[in-house]
Amino acid sequence: MALDSAKKQEIISKFAEHEGDTGSPAVQIALLSERISYLTEHLKEHKKDHSSRLGLLKLVGQRKRLLNYLKRKDYEKYTQVIKELGIRG
């Protein structure tokens, strides 16, 4: 399931670097993290939903690539994002 537009706008406004920013790595990582957490909860209830599991693995891989990119390009923003999202322990 996709995020509802209100939740999506809330995430975008929280992580956007400027007005109208929807594609920066920080925003993309935050949106992916929300979808990952939703799918994780879904899979706890529906253990045999293998297509959703594959989708989850794709999202995790995409988020990992974006995090590595952000780490290379803007380390301060990277540390801020992982702290706010509570990822990479």
From Swiss-Prot:
Listed InterPro entries: Ribosomal_uS15, Ribosomal_uS15_bac-type, uS15_NS1_RNA-bd_sf
Pfam families named in the record: Ribosomal_S15 (PF00312)
GO molecular function, one term: rRNA binding
PROSITE patterns, alphabetized: RIBOSOMAL_S15
The UniProt record lists the keyword Lipid metabolism: no
Cystine bridges: none
UniProt keyword terms in alphabetical order: Ribonucleoprotein, Ribosomal protein, RNA-binding, rRNA-binding
GO CC terms of this entry: cytosolic small ribosomal subunit
Domain of life (superkingdom): Bacteria
Subunit structure: Part of the 30S ribosomal subunit. Forms a bridge to the 50S subunit in the 70S ribosome, contacting the 23S rRNA.
Family affiliation: Belongs to the universal ribosomal protein uS15 family.
Function statement: One of the primary rRNA binding proteins, it binds directly to 16S rRNA where it helps nucleate assembly of the platform of the 30S subunit by binding and bridging several RNA helices of the 16S rRNA. Forms an intersubunit bridge (bridge B4) with the 23S rRNA of the 50S subunit in the ribosome.
PANTHER family in UniProt: RIBOSOMAL PROTEIN S15, BACTERIAL AND ORGANELLAR, SMALL RIBOSOMAL SUBUNIT PROTEIN US15M
Protein name as annotated: Small ribosomal subunit protein uS15
Annotated organism of origin: Nitratiruptor sp. (strain SB155-2)
Gene label: rpsO
